[in-house]
Amino acid sequence: MLSYITWFFILIGFVTVTSYLVPVLLAAFKWGEQDLKAKYNAKWALVSGSSSGIGRAVAKKLAKQGLNVVLVALDDDALKGTYESLKKEFPNQQFRAVGCNLGKSDHEYDYMPIIKEATKDIDVQILVNNAGYIQLSAFFRSTLQKQLTNLECNMMSHVKITHHFLSNMVEKGLKGCITFTSSQSAFFPAPSCSSYGGGKAFLASFAASLAIECYTYGIDVLCLMSGPIQTNFYDNQPKLSFFKFFHAISDTPDSAADIMLNGVGRITWRDSSLFTIFSRLVVKIVDMNLLVQGIARGQSLSSDFKNHPELR
């Protein structure tokens, strides 16, 4: 006969796993596509990191719904190409290309005045904070400035952009939504990209708290926990063997964009892939202290750890 203590732990395990899996199953089998233009009576969206990958896919899907889109990304050929391509594909929609460096903010350069000037005559109600990049190396082997630049792009730019447009929405009584592109590394140890993982963890926590603050104003907040995606995300990084594994299990940008847009207003944290869901279940079952110690002791067995001294 099972003791009360045994039943107690069974109940804890059941509630822990079930409360996570129910939204996952609803998202997979019940929740369908949403028309965000109609849902929020919106005209304009802004997507950062919109020149490629998930950002470009989201911008295209929003334009397909009839929304005008502000494209924010580095001022390069990729942004120009995306801008021209979307204008050609959606001639009835308006697009604005805003080229700026979201990783740089100091007394000499500030991207916020550029974004504010480009959007001063419109109401942005769909805000997609997607810009980000990874930098692979042991934390101490990279310069402090490189780490701060990574955090500025992946974390602080989202805070600054969100503060501006959220304030406008609340002041004018507009409904809308705000999304953040986070990562599996937000809740799972990410050695060799600790600033990246730390920044993504901030976004997840920030989004959860912000969702509660925004609820009474009719503004939905979602944080996408992305897994490996078939993009140029890992270009210009060390050629690591686990990238081959990531490529084999990676999702398409279109799939991640669908998952993001379908989850808005229905859930706050949305895991975008089987890899992310599996990782989430691991940290629900295995305590973080044990997980960290296990990874720390086992990393020396990895060929990447042995062959790439910059990672250790």
Language model: regions and residue ranges:
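Residue(s) in the substrate-gating loop at a strand-loop-helix junction
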Residues: 183
